Amino acid sequence: MEQYYGTGRRKEAVARVFLRPGNGKVTVNGQDFNEYFQGLVRAVAALEPLRAVDALGRFDAYITVRGGGKSGQIDAIKLGIARALVQYNPDYRAKLKPLGFLTRDARVVERKKYGKHKARRAPQYSKR
């Protein structure tokens, strides 16, 4: 059986996505997609690359995702699915790239500096 693989990362989340020809079943860490991202409206964004190339019901997705929070995991899955689709059909790159699905979002949390409360929040300063 043929399968296509893509890795997606976002913040601290890492998603490994395996696409196999099927009927649209999506499994995340052994659970159904809707069960894993229960009640999160944003979760449907993870499947946008499949919608963009009209492949929503043509593949089963087996996904393992670790680290980060749910939002980062959703974006990691989105990138992983897009990369797996390009592996399946390199012509999809032309559709997915302009929509931003193949771009790794490199923004990460800025580190806390000493002498400050947070990354940028400085202690209150009194002029007089």
Swiss-Prot record:
InterPro entries: Ribosomal_Su5_D2-typ_SF, Ribosomal_uS9, Ribosomal_uS9_bac/plastid, Ribosomal_uS9_CS, Ribsml_uS5_D2-typ_fold_subgr. One of its GO terms (cellular component) is cytosolic small ribosomal subunit. One of its GO terms (molecular function) is rRNA binding. One of its GO terms (biological process) is translation. Gene3D superfamilies: 3.30.230.10. Part of the 30S ribosomal subunit. Contacts proteins S7 and S10. Belongs to the universal ribosomal protein uS9 family. Part of the top of the head of the 30S subunit. The C-terminal region penetrates the head emerging in the P-site where it contacts tRNA. This is Small ribosomal subunit protein uS9. It comes from Thermus thermophilus (strain ATCC BAA-163 / DSM 7039 / HB27). The lineage of its organism: Bacteria, Thermotogati, Deinococcota, Deinococci, Thermales.
